[in-house]
């Protein structure tokens, strides 16, 4: 869809207003991370090296990018153009949970999608990372992506050296892809003591269904596996996790398709976090704007404003205008 040039320039000015009013803290070890961004013209700039907070904020205020990223990886030479020459030294363990990937997402409202993916994020952190894998909560950070889901970052000496294969195994585990009839059958036949994780859950489900372990069939095991997976599996975007050179959205930056912040959420406050209120920059709460809505908007909420607009000219709060223009649903007038 072609975007209106004048409207895009207005949106860029509003993004600039945000970056000039906000001191963004760089990710830890910024000197070892590759930094990249996408301009409002669609150009992708990569292989940048920044030394400190001043350089980061100066870059944001002078270039005013639409999207900003930094690498999960740490490099000896992050500004080298060829990956082998960067000299990889390790990487955070990253999980990307996107509500677009949820079953039945096309029938959900935006708010319902975000609520559902939030529950999956809680499950990933509490059940899999902390309980099953023994990762300390102090090494886990949750970020609202700024649009449709959450990013979970794990930073610790235990995960830094993990290669792509080990990271892929972790995604297979949290999504339940590593679970099979043969794995459960073996655990039942060997009488594995104190099974944990998925095996424990499936065996518990078998007992719950009243199935005798001595007369169990593969079909019954498959049924239990399907029920447990449907309740416990977490849908992560696997390539984001196992790609050890991946760029991920930079915390506190604006998402170019929503105008909302990539916002960190404390683990102990995650239940109360409302992205449709808490991720809207305060500087976007001032004033109203005229916009041209392309087609009737699907019902959704931002703060306490119910967006249900007809096509054509509408006057809306600034943050609503930014959201609709950023997502391609409207243009500034």
Swiss-Prot record:
One of its GO terms (cellular component) is DNA-directed RNA polymerase complex. Keywords: DNA replication, DNA-directed RNA polymerase, Magnesium, Manganese, Metal-binding, Nucleotidyltransferase, Primosome, Transcription, Transferase. It comes from the Archaea. It holds the Pfam family DNA_primase_S. GO terms for molecular function: DNA-directed RNA polymerase activity; metal ion binding. The gene is priS. Catalytic subunit of DNA primase, an RNA polymerase that catalyzes the synthesis of short RNA molecules used as primers for DNA polymerase during DNA replication. The small subunit contains the primase catalytic core and has DNA synthesis activity on its own. Binding to the large subunit stabilizes and modulates the activity, increasing the rate of DNA synthesis while decreasing the length of the DNA fragments, and conferring RNA synthesis capability. The DNA polymerase activity may enable DNA primase to also catalyze primer extension after primer synthesis. May also play a role in DNA repair. Its EC number is 2.7.7.-. This is DNA primase small subunit PriS. The active site is at residues 96, 98, 237. SUPFAM superfamilies: Prim-pol domain (SSF56747). One of its GO terms (biological process) is DNA replication, synthesis of primer. Heterodimer of a small subunit (PriS) and a large subunit (PriL). Belongs to the eukaryotic-type primase small subunit family. HAMAP family: DNA_primase_sml_arc (MF_00700). Its cofactor is Mg(2+); Mn(2+).
């Amino acid at each position: 869809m072609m975007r209106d040039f004048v409207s895009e320039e207005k949106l860029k000015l509003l993004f600039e207003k945000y970056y000039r009013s906000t001191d963004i803290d760089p990710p830890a070890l910024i000197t070892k991370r590759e930094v990249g961004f996408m301009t409002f013209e669609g150009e992708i700039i990569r292989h940048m090296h920044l030394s400190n907070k001043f350089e980061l904020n100066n870059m944001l205020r002078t270039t005013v990018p639409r999207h900003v990223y930094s690498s999960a990886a740490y490099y000896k030479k992050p500004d080298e153009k060829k990956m082998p020459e960067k000299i990889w030294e390790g990487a955070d363990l990253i999980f990307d949970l996107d509500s677009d990937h949820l079953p039945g997402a096309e029938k959900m409202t935006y708010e319902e999608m975000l609520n559902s993916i939030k529950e999956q994020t809680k499950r990933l952190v509490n059940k899999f990372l902390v309980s099953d894998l023994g990762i300390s909560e102090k090494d886990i950070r949750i970020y609202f992506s700024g649009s449709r889901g959450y990013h979970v970052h794990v930073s610790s000496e235990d995960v830094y050296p993990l290669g792509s294969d080990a990271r892929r195994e972790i995604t297979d585990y949290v999504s339940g892809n590593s679970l099979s009839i043969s794995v459960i059958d073996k655990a039942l036949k060997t009488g594995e003591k104190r099974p944990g994780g998925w095996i424990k859950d499936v065996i518990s489900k078998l007992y719950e269904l009243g199935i005798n372990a001595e007369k169990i069939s593969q079909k019954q095991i498959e049924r239990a596996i399907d029920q447990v997976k449907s309740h416990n599996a977490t849908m992560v975007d696997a390539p984001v996790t196992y790609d050890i050179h991946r760029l991920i959205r930079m915390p506190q930056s604006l998402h170019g398709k929503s105008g909302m912040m990539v916002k960190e959420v404390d683990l102990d406050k995650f239940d109360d976090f409302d992205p449709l209120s808490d991720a809207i920059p305060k500087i976007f709460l001032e004033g109203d704007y005229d916009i041209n809505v392309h087609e009737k908007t699907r019902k959704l909420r931002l703060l306490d404003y119910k967006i249900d607009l007809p096509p054509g000219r509408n006057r809306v709060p600034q943050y609503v205008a930014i959201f609709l223009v950023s997502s391609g649903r409207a243009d500034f007038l």
